[in-house]
Amino acid sequence: MPILCTTGCSRKAFLKRPKTGDTLCRECFFLAFETEIHNTIEQNKLFRRGDVVAIAASGGKDSTVLAHVLKVLNERYDYGLKLVLLSIDEGITGYRDDSLETVKRNRDDYGMELKILSYDELYGWTMDKIVSKIGRSNNCTFCGVFRRQALDRGARLMEVDCVATGHNADDIAETVLMNILRGDTARLRRCCDIKTGGKDADSIPRVKPLKYAYEKEIVMYAHFKKLVYFSTECVFAPNAYRGHARAFLKDLERIRPSVIMDIIHSGEQLSFKDTVKKPLRGKCNRCGFVSSQQPCKACVLLEGLNRGLPKLGVGKKSKANRMIAAQNSLRQSANLVKTDF
């Protein structure tokens, strides 16, 4: 006897939801998945009518599903949003150039404006060039820092009201684990926030509508909806620290299926003593973008690359400051020698 959909629609069950364990038909799964994201948006007041929302589009499953679902919900519930696509070209041959073709396909399919910004035009460097200088170690540090700022720059250029990113529940849980393992209380405070930034006129908020959506269900939704997305992993990703947190999370999930939501809820409930130092977020005194240090991490990393010190800014801030001071001292000495002659 066939298993029927647990919603009582009388249709044959097609899948079992990893998140809830419910056996659902395809149509009821689509509706449940979309409704949960709608509830997340409404309960957390992520958007306001009339907002221009930039979807951070990489061509991967998360951003593709996010673009599709936001378009569906915007029309179904009359959010009154203008949706646009914002993509960052990191300059990774054989990866980002291919994925951007998928983003362009999404642009055409959904009728959304698309803006592509490259590291090369913003910073004068591509990730291929950076990796040729620093090797395969710490390359994700450069890419992550530059990408976050590139999204801010792109959002400002497009004059949007907020940026929607495709971070899913697995991503959030992994980040909580990473910050616990690194003892990074500053990032641990905000990694579970569904909305960040936007506290001053020059700061554009970011929102995570897929915060409670399981990665497995995002893949299932994209597959059964026949959405076009790019599924190749970044060629530089295998050495990323996040990979260890991801593997650990998968091991935990086999033992306790609810562990992803458990970790997220634990992260949301964490509180810190008043004596724990909390870095103040302001503007970088060089580039003017949001930062919790002076100068910002992007400016420090970029200065290191331009000075021929690619390791500058990788590691502790005090080490970076010492390296900058030493380099300045050498420059001053060189200028004095030139003056003597």
UniProtKB/Swiss-Prot annotation:
InterPro entries: CTU1-like_ATP-bd, CTU1_C, Ncs6/Tuc1/Ctu1, Rossmann-like_a/b/a_fold, TilS/TtcA_N, tRNA_thiolation_TtcA_Ctu1. It is an enzyme of class 2 (transferase). GO terms for cellular component: cytosol; cytosolic tRNA wobble base thiouridylase complex; mitochondrion. Keywords: Cytoplasm, RNA-binding, Transferase, tRNA processing, tRNA-binding. Its EC number is 2.7.7.-. Pathway: tRNA modification; 5-methoxycarbonylmethyl-2-thiouridine-tRNA biosynthesis. It comes from the Eukaryota. GO terms for biological process: protein urmylation; tRNA thio-modification; tRNA wobble position uridine thiolation; tRNA wobble uridine modification. Pfam families: ATP_bind_3, zn-ribbon_14. Signal peptide: none annotated. It is found in: Cytoplasm. One of its GO terms (molecular function) is tRNA binding. Plays a central role in 2-thiolation of mcm(5)S(2)U at tRNA wobble positions of tRNA(Lys), tRNA(Glu) and tRNA(Gln). Directly binds tRNAs and probably acts by catalyzing adenylation of tRNAs, an intermediate required for 2-thiolation. It is unclear whether it acts as a sulfurtransferase that transfers sulfur from thiocarboxylated URM1 onto the uridine of tRNAs at wobble position. Belongs to the TtcA family. CTU1/NCS6/ATPBD3 subfamily. This is Cytoplasmic tRNA 2-thiolation protein 1.
